[in-house]
Curated annotation (Swiss-Prot):
It catalyses: L-seryl-[protein] + ATP = O-phospho-L-seryl-[protein] + ADP + H(+); L-threonyl-[protein] + ATP = O-phospho-L-threonyl-[protein] + ADP + H(+). The active site is at 202 (proton acceptor). One of its GO terms (molecular function) is ATP binding. This is Serine/threonine-protein kinase-transforming protein Rmil. ATP binds at residues 89-97, 109. Pfam families: PK_Tyr_Ser-Thr (PF07714). Residues 83-343 form the Protein kinase domain. Belongs to the protein kinase superfamily. TKL Ser/Thr protein kinase family. RAF subfamily. InterPro entries: Kinase-like_dom_sf, Prot_kinase_dom, Protein_kinase_ATP_BS, Ser-Thr/Tyr_kinase_cat_dom, Ser/Thr_kinase_AS, Ser/Thr_Kinases-Pseudokinases. Residues 1-14, 49-73 have a biased composition (Basic and acidic residues). The lineage of its organism: Viruses, Riboviria, Pararnavirae, Artverviricota, Revtraviricetes. Residues 1-80 are annotated as: Disordered.
Amino acid sequence: MEAVIKDLIRDQGVRGEGGSTAGLSATPPASLPGSLTNVKALQKSPGPQRERKSSSSSEDRNRMKTLGRRDSSDDWEIPDGQITVGQRIGSGSFGTVYKGKWHGDVAVKMLNVTAPTPQQLQAFKNEVGVLRKTRHVNILLFMGYSTKPQLAIVTQWCEGSSLYHHLHIIETKFEMIKLIDIARQTAQGMDYLHAKSIIHRDLKSNNIFLHEDLTVKIGDFGLATVKSRWSGSHQFEQLSGSILWMAPEVIRMQDKNPYSFQSDVYAFGIVLYELMTGQLPYSNINNRDQIIFMVGRGYLSPDLSKVRSNCPKAMKRLMAECLKKKRDERPLFPQILASIELLARSLPKIHRSASEPSLNRAGFQTEDFSLYACASPKTPIQAGGIGEWAVHLLKGLLLGLVVILLLVVCLPCLLQCVSSSIRKMIDNSLGYREEYKKLQEAYKQPERRA
């Protein structure tokens, strides 16, 4: 065995003239048989060198572990200069949204705070600590935040338009199945947020985005503590900008914290109203202060009579439940989601064409409601469903049949009455003529006698 080892060492050129092994390689030769375990003793490096290698490996492992984890809010902060801010998309009371670049397209919301106090900055980071844990198909993905040059939230970029834009600007022609599915996906996303103890506080059609495949993405949620701690002027602007979706208790602002799961439910009820009517509530009132006063006092509610006639009754009942004036009487999103899913299962199904794209990647692809198909929330229904024009036509035909039936039944009686009246008139006229003749004869007789 010893002779074999010496031959192997000689082949590698590591044996010195004096028979020492000072030039031995740190790795065993590839041809070394696996049974020669005694070679391991010859491969040992000096003690100090081995310790340095072990220390370096430990540091590398710690560094990789740090890079692989983002456990604190500070790990999600994007350094100044890494985000390229591009086109301005829109603005609100709380901030302005831009399209930006950061490892791809992102949405950057610059908050309306120029010099936050340490308390505000800490509140902002605390809220970010909640947002970074959200992962759902119907929620805009939180990607990070920045504090310089100003506070900003970075989320995924959604290729598509808001639900508000679809319903009230370009009037996208949705079928009823898609309107119901938009409601289902929105309820699904809100149910997830509430399960995470996140209150949206500003749910409205402007903050519900439809991706290219009509997947709902809810945005602009969270930051509740930040919104409540910043100046009252910002709160007032937010109130005036979103009053159509605000619950009565939020408008009154009598409670210390009027926002709750139920206030989000009320806002969802207004979104349902938009979906099922194609209109905004209180469109006949132009005075914003009047709306604030009447809704806050409980004198005004959305007019559910404007809901389309082809809207399922279960959806209309759910809408009325969500819009209850008393907070405790409204359902919560687990119940809402279950109701919408039950409604979807109870309606008729048809098979889709293989070439037709799926409605969304979260499921709900096979169900279609031909009886509830409509061209647009604002236009009459086209082929494929019973439209308003067909209802009016049917009513007209029924009314015509009733009139004809009345004429057939009543015409003989009417003719008889008319004929009898005419006969009486003739008889009366003849009687008057006879009496007139008698009077004439009676008048002539005295003259003859004279």
